[in-house]
């Protein structure tokens, strides 16, 4: 979606908000942002955090956000990126275990040196 919007000149006027239960750690968040997400709502993590014993739901939520942001900053610093704007849409990941045809079709601009599974596989 990010690449398509950029191609037709609409990306700067559009925000991509991903609401997902699939974020389990800061790496998942980093991948979504690197592939173009403007914001991410990891609703399943927030739901689990509110049930954390010995802290209020608000404290648990704040701790979760701090942890995700800290992890994202660590990942960005390892990649040599200092702003979220510079990281968004950067595609600074490599696909492992997927054929170049699959990667080119589903993850444009993503590197894949090893190759692997095809659609029929």
Where do the PLM segments sit?
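Catalytic or ion-translocation cores adjacent to nucleophile or general acid/base/metal-coordination motifs
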Residues: 1-16, 20-74, 111
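Flexible, glycine-rich loop/tail regions that form catalytic "lids" or insertion modules at the edges
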Residues: 29, 55-121
């Amino acid at each position: 979606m990010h690449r398509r919007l950029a191609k037709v000149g609409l990306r700067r006027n559009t925000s991509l908000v991903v609401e997902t239960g699939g974020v389990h750690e800061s790496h998942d968040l980093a991948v979504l942002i690197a592939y173009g997400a403007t914001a991410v709502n990891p609703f399943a993590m927030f739901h689990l955090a509110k049930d954390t014993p010995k802290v209020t739901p608000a404290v648990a939520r704040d701790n979760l956000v701090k942890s995700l942001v800290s992890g994202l900053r660590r990942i960005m610093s390892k990649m040599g990126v200092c702003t979220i704007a510079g990281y968004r849409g950067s595609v600074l990941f490599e696909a492992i275990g997927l054929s170049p045809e699959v990667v080119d079709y589903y993850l444009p601009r993503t590197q894949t040196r090893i190759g692997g599974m095809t659609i029929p596989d």
